[in-house]
């Protein structure tokens, strides 16, 4: 055997690099926590097996979770199977372990130390190590991923990730924060360093349809483009025996079919081709979810009241538009929209009016803010004073030859009736609203390219109110950012930056409330509705714990994330299909669960 000679200087350099990579020393005074006694929310009666079939309205434009076109609704399925260091208990909001088994806090108030589970594995069998978390920082800072928000956050908000051996790390943020916020804002998910060979200018295109290794209970196993995506449960998942994971993630397969029309999807559900169907929309709950399938007990209905931050749902006004850049027009438009009429008629009184962009965040929500009420007299006065006195033969106002005509883009056909009512009343104030229904993919692209005038949508919620991504001028006037109103206000910028940097909880609350007032005053967002519950129907072979959801459940039928608590009873499935053929009846089921119902409205 031949041995290659190594220069002594090279040997010293290699040794030096090895020592430096593990040279960090843990502080001696750390107090480690684990919260292993957190209460499970699954049922010991749950059984494994079977498949769960659901639908999505559009096929995802990419499997990437960062970069162009990645911010689609499908991303939530992928992210839910990528564990972070810790998570929040869905009922108590206390910190619970995931990849980290223990954590401790640095004296600086902005550093958290984590001990990683040595048994953690990627779906391809490779171990999850400290290097994967260090790589996350490099990955998210790379310009090649074409993701400005991530570039900014991981560059300016997370200042360092340090390694103390293969299974211990620390994360330090830019400023000190309360302990629970350190985990949320500075927490990381690992990125498989062994999988990404090179992050270069071709990364976006190269990884558009790559199935990335993950750490969660399921992995994508089959893709039929434009038709369906299948996830399979890992039979040897490394975290399956964790106390909080037992009796969860029970079905063997999760199949997501692409069905581009909700009415057609409901027909698939009634045929037994889908296992559940969300019935939040009043039209479906009151008009469709009835008949023999329900009367005979084959389909069961659940209403579950939750208590969590509410989606920022409403109309977003693009201030780069020549008409909507005028603040009086924006305020007048808000007064010309009769949302209460929509709630009473189309929505059957089921929904409530959302009052502000951030609601349900406790003291971080400004409860003194109310959405502008429908008031045609006020709308007309404002527009007259703003120079829009003249009207055409059709009643639409005109100023300097320009009609007060605006396009509303929206992505759900089921919303057409509600917007038609608003359109009719707005015309009484001389405002023409043209309804532009788009498929989900086109709707998303239009908004991300800032090509809309008015966009109807709802943003997902977070742990605390988020202002920077939605309202800071850094994200205005350019595509692929979440400031879709293009709000550009230096005073608001200043307070957003102060809010992000503030370490005192009381001061942060005051800043959050002040920012909420400024955003309301800017009139770039018109709140629409909030829904204080989730509800749906399912075939009786889907079984649930006594509480079919958690305090923060947005749906009862989530197979991933903090869900996965239902299971398929194969015996009941066979029995139900036979009963349907021979007309055997069961007791009808229409249950309401209100243990987490809000005592007072926001």
Where are these regions (language model features)?
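N-terminal lobe/hinge region of extracytoplasmic solute-binding protein
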Residues: 26-40, 51-107, 138, 213
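Surface-exposed binding/hinge segments that line
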Residues: 115, 150-198, 217-224
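Detector for C-terminal structural segments
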Residues: 35-37, 56, 77, 224-229, ...
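Extracellular/periplasmic solute-recognition and catalytic clefts
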Residues: 143, 147, 221-232, 257-321, ...
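Aromatic- and charge-enriched surface segment that lines or borders ligand/interaction sites
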Residues: 101-146, 170-172, 258, 265-268, ...
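Gly/Pro-rich hinge or "lid" segments in bacterial periplasmic/extracellular proteins
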Residues: 82, 89-94, 186-248, 253, ...
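Alpha-helical secondary-structure segments
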Residues: 53, 129-136, 168-172, 178, ...
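Ligand-site clamp/hinge motif
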Residues: 206-209, 237-289, 423, 427-440
